[in-house]
Amino acid sequence: MFNLFQKKSDNSPRQIAIGDVHGHYDGLCQLVDFCQIVPEDRLYFLGDVIDRGPKSAEVVKWIRERNYPCLMGNHEVMLLTSFNNGDLDEMALRHWLPSGGDATLESYGDEGISQDEIDWFTSLPSYLDLGDVFLVHAGVDPFRSLDQQNNDQFCWIREKFLSNHFPYFTDKTIVTGHTITFTLPGVRPGELAQGPGWIDIESV
């Protein structure tokens, strides 16, 4: 199951980043209950809130009703590519559906994904800079400035980011999901992974 990263400073609300929910609405509710979330807490979702799990529609509804910030993940990118300007892209669908998109479509039932929801997915930011914490779904290209990057890097990058030996920022920590932590050397299932200037919380 997905994990979280939380930061608490004196006399300030908790900042809680939640990793790839992937349609697991019941697990999300359990995590929120376990953390004893209060209205003052600031929750941030790192993308990939849809696909694979059986309740993507419920996850999206829950996040939207509470107006929590949510980042673009590679699975949201696949959804949007499949719904290309309102028209279904058959080639993109053949890639998205086996990657968990079939479960997302099923969760929306006969009504399907509305244009309002497509607009919401489209509006998701690629990253959030919270000062000393930088939230992004997959990572950053260590050899490019932020303004030289797009969702190809922010939502999909893996080895190039994780294998870099130097922190991208000197004054903030990058928090990501996307890469399952126990696929990295020396990390056991359920553990977070850390590297130079980054923390990966996708500890399935």
Please state what every model-predicted region is:
Residues 151-204:
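Conserved beta-sheet core of the metallophosphoesterase superfamily
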Residues 1-60:
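N-terminal active-site segment of His-dependent metallophosphoesterases
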Residues 118-148:
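Active-site-adjacent alpha/beta core region of enzyme catalytic domains
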Residues 20, 48, 63, 73-74, ...:
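Divalent metal-coordination and catalytic microenvironments
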Residues 2-11, 36, 60-63, 126-129, ...:
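A short acidic-Thr-Gly-centered motif at the start of a beta-strand
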